[in-house]
Amino acid sequence: MAALRPLTKPKIVKKRTKKFIRHQSDRYVKIRRNWRKPRGIDNRVRSGFKGQMLMPNIGYGSNKKTKHMLPSGFKKFLVHNVKELEVLLMSNKSYCAEIAHNVSSKNRKVIVERAAQLAIKVTNPNARLRSEENE
């Protein structure tokens, strides 16, 4: 079977690829880099002074058409069983399945086989599958 491709694959443009880092995280080791909104009354970052760190805001949002889109052009849909997989039957050109982390390896095999029959792309088909020589 040929590789499954999305119906359309628009160019995904990110307005910012750098991470937003927390104010003064470069100055103190105890302050982690993970973003926290500054809430102090005299804070320069919150006030938006020139030359300060940038704060995440609505303007950095993605295009509606490409939001949550994977580089392959599909959007992810989390699947726990075969019944949930069959929901994607009509929209297999725009959505791909991702098997949930808590699905057993026995059920994973069934889901992957059914996805191949329905021509649905699975992002993690080889996860938790043992090779034949180990058995």
Curated annotation (Swiss-Prot):
Any Gene Ontology biological process: translation
Q: Which InterPro entries match?
A: Ribosomal_eL32 (IPR001515), Ribosomal_eL32_CS (IPR018263), Ribosomal_eL32_sf (IPR036351)
- Source organism's superkingdom? Eukaryota
Q: Which GO terms describe its cellular component?
A: cytosolic large ribosomal subunit
Give GO MF terms, alphabetically: structural constituent of ribosome
Question: Which UniProt keyword terms apply here?
Answer: Cytoplasm, Ribonucleoprotein, Ribosomal protein
The transmembrane residues are none
Where in or outside the cell it occurs: the entry states: Cytoplasm
Query: Which Pfam family is one of those matched by this entry?
Result: Ribosomal_L32e
Q: What is its main location?
A: cytoplasm
* Assembly: Component of the large ribosomal subunit.
Q: Function, please?
A: Component of the large ribosomal subunit. The ribosome is a large ribonucleoprotein complex responsible for the synthesis of proteins in the cell.
> According to its UniProt record, which protein family does this protein belong to?
Belongs to the eukaryotic ribosomal protein eL32 family.
Q: Give the PANTHER family listed for this entry.
A: 60S RIBOSOMAL PROTEIN L32 AND DNA-DIRECTED RNA POLYMERASE II, SUBUNIT N (PTHR23413), RIBOSOMAL PROTEIN L32 (PTHR23413:SF1)
Q: What is this protein called?
A: Large ribosomal subunit protein eL32
Q: Which organism is it from?
A: Ictalurus punctatus (Channel catfish)
- Designated gene of the protein: rpl32
